[in-house]
């Protein structure tokens, strides 16, 4: 080879040459092994033309090991099928007469990297080696046995293995025919131009599976794929076909790692359960992964939940479902149309250790198949394993069922044989044996003959290839069924461009012939609207019409009018109930009780005061302001009845007037009293003259002025916003429309209520301030301290009222809670004033009349001086026990005051 083309050829193969130089069989010692002796990792059969073979005799190893357990069906059955086909061709006088086919068969160990390493054996003979620098000990050149030239390869099984091997074989133009690889990627003739297969591409299989899913009325499925070309390409093809055909949505696409960790399959099942409606699982996985998925489903107690649909890697194999029959029941599988080869059954059943020495793995198969050991040294003490006798027979002493791909292995070998036969006929016409034009065989020419073969396969099916090297799509459809305690695969249909499915033959766990559901979304219930999922036309979310919405049509929710709420099933609207506080409501019991008792007590006090109007205690309490205060207390109690009465124009008008008026009257009277006391004592500190406006008439005038301000505000309110009742649908518009209520109430908002009571609160706070300022006045001189205690207690009541009243604004019982809170607070305020200011006086009047006598009169100067000195002395009260200093001082101050001849304004003690 010379010129640019030659250099390009060598540069393209330079990396491979470097790899081969590291490979163990490249050294002369290994190449010098005598022909016909089996290698440790391969079967070598002599012939005029050598075919390569790649089979997964062992599974993938773990913990750094290349190979694992023996695979009896996928490995030994398929390998023996190739040997069986070679024997038939070599014994056929009409096919390749006088030409013997040999073989070099390797174990891929179900791993693409190991298969790559093994397949380097096939290209050794195609690379010439320069041995000029290699000399033996005698100085002569070494004798190197040239490796056999492999003209074509049968295999591999897994798509990922075939892809890896095809990348090397195409460099050396070695045709390859696979018997099991179905990944759509291998149909790319620009990348895998020397690859052909006797099984159809997964593109056909994916279409068939989509047709099955649609026939079963499933529209929501998950996919599960083994990592690698076969699984990932198969799922990708299925998804693509489902999109093209429509009507099928993919819930999840889960990938099984090439080297799964402990617990990985349990996580996969857990993830699949996240979309529990997707009960149908489309599986493109190797049989080891399939089995571990089924085991994980059983551990998760999901037997009967999932409905499996397996690709041809599952097919009708027993290994994935062995002792997992309950979990696998109902599984629908697909397999390229095949027929059991009876001749192979007879051939394989007759294999023994004596007549099958060419298969170097047959002894291992024998031990595994019959559960015995060939060597006594391998038997362990106490073990139940027996020694092999060589009298065991396959199918008699062990179970036997032909593996599903045996037919395709035989067809692949025959396709290679027919291509070589046609090539020999054209290149060596009339010649016996090989002619120079076929020695060596040109791979490019052989590929053309392979693509043009057309013959009846071992099962009678036509064997042909299209321009991409793919076989036509013909599938049988199976279902794994259990009956009477036994399980088996039943043919339920076929697919050849179109689906032919016998649904009446199908059996489902728990439901018999009734089709199980694996649908994206259940029909929406009344009151729910459909919200389609973007990119998934068959899927939708059922979203309930929330809040005050009702269902207009399948896709729309609309809000009810403001005075209506949705019905129970949210298909229409209905009026919102209107509520008010009833007289017989439990919420009205306490306010009415307090009001009735309060009014009775107030009237009792008024009657007592009127009857004993001229007694010293009544006079000393300031009769005029006392009656005003009692009137305010009465109105506070009476307001309760207005608050509970049904709101109308009259009731709402009276509420505006009297709700704040009663409190204003009460606190105006108390404020006038405390202000009078404060001014008297403050004036006394500066002079002996009496302050202004302390007469009863002045006090009444001040009180009515304060009250008139409240009335003036109410009048302005009536003018600006006339009173009326309203039905408030917003106030009790709860989040749950079932509890929504229209509240019949007066047009008094929370803000209006604050303004209405605000003036009364201002009077109350001011009165409290004066009560604090006069707290130091001796209690024997006035009623400032009882007023102070009254105001302190009242403040506490209203401080408790505020959070309760405004904190329940969002409650469904807001009307009841706020009305009850307001009326009880008003009644308690009135009760505090009535109880602390008047009940002690009534008690003395009725039960201790001896105390209802006039007191000594004191001058203003004496009273003020005593109060002032008392305050100062209180700070030093610890110098005299029991307050003796205070009493003594007061008495010392009294004598000069009585003896003086000056005229002072005098007041009775209680009058102050």
From Swiss-Prot:
The GO molecular function terms of this record are: G protein-coupled receptor activity; glutamate receptor activity; group III metabotropic glutamate receptor activity
The answer, when asked if Magnesium is one of the entry's keywords, is no
* Localization, UniProt: Cell membrane
List residues in topological domain: Cytoplasmic: 608-624, 672-699, 773-786, 848-912
Residues that span the membrane, as ranges: 587-607, 625-645, 654-671, 700-720, 752-772, 787-807, 827-847
Q: Which residues lie on this side of the membrane: Extracellular?
A: 33-586, 646-653, 721-751, 808-826
Where would I find glycosylation on this chain?
98, 301
Signal peptide (from-to): 1-32
Q: What is the protein's membrane topology class?
A: Multi-pass membrane protein
Residues noted as binding L-glutamate in the record, renumbered to the chain: 159, 180-182, 230, 312, 405
**Keywords associated with the record:** Cell membrane, Disulfide bond, G-protein coupled receptor, Glycoprotein, Membrane, Receptor, Signal, Transducer, Transmembrane, Transmembrane helix
Q: Which coarse location class describes where this protein primarily resides?
A: membrane
Give the record's GO biological process terms: adenylate cyclase-inhibiting G protein-coupled glutamate receptor signaling pathway; chemical synaptic transmission; learning; presynaptic modulation of chemical synaptic transmission
GO terms for cellular component: cerebellar granule cell to Purkinje cell synapse; glutamatergic synapse; neuron projection; parallel fiber to Purkinje cell synapse; presynaptic active zone membrane
Cysteine-cysteine disulfides: 67-109, 249-538, 372-388, 428-435, 520-539, 524-542, 545-557, 560-573
Q: Provide the function of this protein.
A: G-protein coupled receptor for glutamate. Ligand binding causes a conformation change that triggers signaling via guanine nucleotide-binding proteins (G proteins) and modulates the activity of down-stream effectors. Signaling inhibits adenylate cyclase activity.
Q: Which PANTHER family match?
A: METABOTROPIC GLUTAMATE RECEPTOR
Oligomer and partners: Interacts with PICK1.
Family note: Belongs to the G-protein coupled receptor 3 family.
The protein, known as:
Metabotropic glutamate receptor 4
State which gene encodes it: Grm4
């Amino acid at each position: 080879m010379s010129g640019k083309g030659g250099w390009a050829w060598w540069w393209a193969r330079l990396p491979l040459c470097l790899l081969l130089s590291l490979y163990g069989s490249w050294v002369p010692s290994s190449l010098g092994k005598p022909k016909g002796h089996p290698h440790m990792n391969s079967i070598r059969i002599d012939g005029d033309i050598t075919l390569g073979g790649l089979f997964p005799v062992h599974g993938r190893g773990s913990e750094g090991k290349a190979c694992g357990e023996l695979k009896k069906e996928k490995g030994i059955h398929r390998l023996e099928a190739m040997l069986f086909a070679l024997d038939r061709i070599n014994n056929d006088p009409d096919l390749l007469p006088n030409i013997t086919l040999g073989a070099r068969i390797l174990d891929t160990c179900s791993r693409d990297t190991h298969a790559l390493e093994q397949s380097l054996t096939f290209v050794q003979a195609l690379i010439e080696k320069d041995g000029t620098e290699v000399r033996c000990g005698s100085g002569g050149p070494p004798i190197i046995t040239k490796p056999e030239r492999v003209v074509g390869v049968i295999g591999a099984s897994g798509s990922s293995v075939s892809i890896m091997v095809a990348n090397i074989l195409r460099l050396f133009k070695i045709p390859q025919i696979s018997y099991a690889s179905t990944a759509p990627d291998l149909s790319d003739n620009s990348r895998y131009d020397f690859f052909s297969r006797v099984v159809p591409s997964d593109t056909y299989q994916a279409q068939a599976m989509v047709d099955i899913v649609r026939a079963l009325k499933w529209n929501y499925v998950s996919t599960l794929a083994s990592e690698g070309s076969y699984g990932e390409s198969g799922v990708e093809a299925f998804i693509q076909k489902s999109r093209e055909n429509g009507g099928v949505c993919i819930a999840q696409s889960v990938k099984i790692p090439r080297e799964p960790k402990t617990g990985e399959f349990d996580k996969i099942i857990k993830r699949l359960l996240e979309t529990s409606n997707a009960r149908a699982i489309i599986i493109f996985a190797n049989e080891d992964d399939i089995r571990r998925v089924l085991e994980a489903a059983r551990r998760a107690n999901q037997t009967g939940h999932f409905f499996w649909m397996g690709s041809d890697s599952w097919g009708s194999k027993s290994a994935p479902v062995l002792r997992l029959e309950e979990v696998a029941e109902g599984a629908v599988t697909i397999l390229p149309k095949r027929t059991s080869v009876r001749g192979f059954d007879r051939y394989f059943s007759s294999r023994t250790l004596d007549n099958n020495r060419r298969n170097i793995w047959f002894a291992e198969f024998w031990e595994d198949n019959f559960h015995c050991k060939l060597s006594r040294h391998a038997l362990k003490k106490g073990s139940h394993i027996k020694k092999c006798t060589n009298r065991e027979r396959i199918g008699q002493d062990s179970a036997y069922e032909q593996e599903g791909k045996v037919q395709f292995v035989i067809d692949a070998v025959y396709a290679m044989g027919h291509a070589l036969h046609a090539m020999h006929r054209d290149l060596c016409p009339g010649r016996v044996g090989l002619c120079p034009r076929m020695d060596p065989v040109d791979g490019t020419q052989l590929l053309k003959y392979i693509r043009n073969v057309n013959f009846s396969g071992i099962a009678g099916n036509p064997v042909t290839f299209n321009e991409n090297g793919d076989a036509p799509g013909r599938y049988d459809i199976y279902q794994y069924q259990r009956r009477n305690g036994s399980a088996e695969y039943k043919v339920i249909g076929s697919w050849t461009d179109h689906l032919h499915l016998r649904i009446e033959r199908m059996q489902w766990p728990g439901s018999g012939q009734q089709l199980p559901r694996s649908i994206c979304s259940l029909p929406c219930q009344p009151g729910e609207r459909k919200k389609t999922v973007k990119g998934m036309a068959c899927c939708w979310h059922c979203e309930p019409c929330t809040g005050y919405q009702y269902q207009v049509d399948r896709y729309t929710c609309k809000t009810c009018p403001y005075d209506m709420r949705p019905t129970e099933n949210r298909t229409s609207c209905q009026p919102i109930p209107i509520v008010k506080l009833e007289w017989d409501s439990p919420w009205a019991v306490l306010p009415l009780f307090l009001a009735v008792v309060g009014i009775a007590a107030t009237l009792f006090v008024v009657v007592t005061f009127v009857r004993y109007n001229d007694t010293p205690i009544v006079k000393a309490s300031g009769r005029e302001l006392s009656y005003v205060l009692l009137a305010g207390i009465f109105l506070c109690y009476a307001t309760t009845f207005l608050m509970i009465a049904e709101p109308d124009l009259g009731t709402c008008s009276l509420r505006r007037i009297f709700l704040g008026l009663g409190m204003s009257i009460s606190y105006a009277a108390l404020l006038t009293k405390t202000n009078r006391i404060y001014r008297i004592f403050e004036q006394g500190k500066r002079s002996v003259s009496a302050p202004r406006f302390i007469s009863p008439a002045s006090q009444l005038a001040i009180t009515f002025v304060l009250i008139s301000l409240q009335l003036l505000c109410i009048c302005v309110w009536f003018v600006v916003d006339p009173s009326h009742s309203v039905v408030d649908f917003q106030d009790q518009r709860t989040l749950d429309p079932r509890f929504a209520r229209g509240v019949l109430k007066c047009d008094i908002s929370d803000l209006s209520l604050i303004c209405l009571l605000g003036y009364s609160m201002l009077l109350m706070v001011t009165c409290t301030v004066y009560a604090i300022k006069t707290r130091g006045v001796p209690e024997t001189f006035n009623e400032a301290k009882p007023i102070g205690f009254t105001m302190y207690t009242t403040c506490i009541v209203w401080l408790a009222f505020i959070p309760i009243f405004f904190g329940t604004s969002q409650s469904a019982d807001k009307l009841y809670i706020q009305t009850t809170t307001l009326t009880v607070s008003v009644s308690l305020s009135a009760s505090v004033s009535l109880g602390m200011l008047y009940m002690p006086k009534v008690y003395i009047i009725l039960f201790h009349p001896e105390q209802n006598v006039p007191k000594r009169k004191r001058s203003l100067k004496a009273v003020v001086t005593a109060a002032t000195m008392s305050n100062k002395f209180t700070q030093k009260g610890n110098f005299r026990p029991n307050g003796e200093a205070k009493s003594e001082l007061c008495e010392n101050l009294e004598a000069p005051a009585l003896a003086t001849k000056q005229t002072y304004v005098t007041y009775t003690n209680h009058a102050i």
